[in-house]
């Protein structure tokens, strides 16, 4: 039983396959490449690892194919301290992959979601109810039995399943965090089940039509997100940190820590996972 709540993540699990080349091949052409890399990825998996490394009791809900990539992803999550009892191994679909061609400082990506789209909302809801009964030692018929726990969802899985999962988690008492990445719009009826929405500036512009570049546009964008029905909103701004609204509607800025940037891959996912872990500690937004 988790003494101070859990973090449950419903999200994508991908194997990233990356290769560098001097130029992009034309149709029917083969060019030489180098620096082939395989990396575990997927926003859900990244966020789960971040939460676990921050000390949170973290559970992954998702699906992989019954293949080598799926086995490797699950093993990596477990090595990071993430419980994978609710990761389904599917025989009818392959593990999600991202194939990346790196060329002259740019890249081109082909994403194959595979098993990431295999779970329906009821599959996730069933896992959440099991977590409430088993890990939290509570009766799923109680009012808000998961109070004090956090549920995270993003936009890389089936959107209808994501919306249904958010509604279920909210009803069970989880503090729900929705990371609309890649940018995606929830059904209107699902927004009130979002306790915190956390896009970056580009995703925010897609959702609200407002690019947050200064105090005025940040306030307008945050209010537009709240008008959708979310309980709170945080916008991440890369090197400029993040912003939210205070209780009186004033803009609150949190600057990014000064550091030497080596690689920004999964920086946003790490932010979400760390935020969820901090929530378990009772820290205010």
Model-assigned labels for residue ranges:
Residues 49, 97-101, 108, 241-245:
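Short beta-strand scaffold segments in enzyme catalytic cores
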Residues 1-63, 68-82, 260-262:
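Glycine-rich phosphate/adenosyl-contacting loop at the front of the ribokinase-like
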Residues 125, 132, 139, 149-220, ...:
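Conserved beta-alpha-beta core of the PfkB/ribokinase-like small-molecule kinase fold
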Residues 49-57, 102, 277-282:
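Alpha-helix C-terminal capping segments
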Residues 89-90, 100-150, 155:
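Conserved phosphate-binding/catalytic loop of the ribokinase/pfkB sugar-kinase fold
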Residues 1-7, 184-189, 215-285:
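Conserved phosphate-binding/catalytic region of the ribokinase-like
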Residues 10, 35, 61-66, 84-95, ...:
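Beta-strand->loop->alpha-helix junctions that form or flank phosphate-binding loops
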């Amino acid at each position: 039983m988790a003494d101070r709540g859990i973090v449950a993540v419903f999200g994508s699990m991908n194997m990233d396959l990356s290769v560098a080349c001097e130029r992009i091949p034309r149709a029917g052409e083969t060019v030489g490449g180098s620096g082939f890399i395989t990396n575990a990825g997927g926003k859900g998996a990244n966020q789960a690892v971040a939460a676990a490394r921050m000390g949170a009791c973290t559970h992954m809900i998702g699906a992989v194919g019954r293949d080598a990539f799926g086995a490797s992803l699950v093993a990596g999550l477990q090595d990071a301290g993430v419980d994978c009892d609710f990761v389904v191994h599917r025989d009818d679909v392959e593990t999600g992959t991202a194939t990346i061609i790196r060329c002259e400082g740019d890249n081109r990506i082909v994403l194959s979601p595979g098993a990431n789209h295999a779970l329906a909302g009821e599959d996730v809801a069933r896992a959440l109810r099991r977590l409430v009964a088993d890990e939290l030692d509570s009766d799923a018929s109680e009012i808000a039995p998961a109070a004090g726990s956090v549920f995270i969802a993003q936009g890389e899985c089936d959107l209808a399943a994501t919306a249904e999962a958010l509604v279920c988690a909210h009803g069970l008492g989880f503090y729900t965090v929705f990371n609309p990445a890649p940018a995606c719009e929830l059904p209107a009826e699902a927004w009130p089940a979002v306790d915190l929405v956390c896009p970056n500036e580009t995703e925010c512009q897609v959702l609200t039509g407002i690019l947050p570049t200064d105090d005025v546009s940040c306030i307008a964008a945050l209010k537009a997100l709240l008008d959708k029905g979310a309980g709170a909103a945080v916008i991440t701004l890369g090197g400029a940190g993040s912003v939210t609204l205070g209780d009186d509607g004033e803009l609150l800025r949190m600057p990014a820590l000064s550091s030497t940037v080596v690689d920004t891959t999964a920086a946003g996912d790490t932010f979400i996972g760390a935020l969820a872990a901090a929530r378990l500690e009772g820290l205010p937004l």
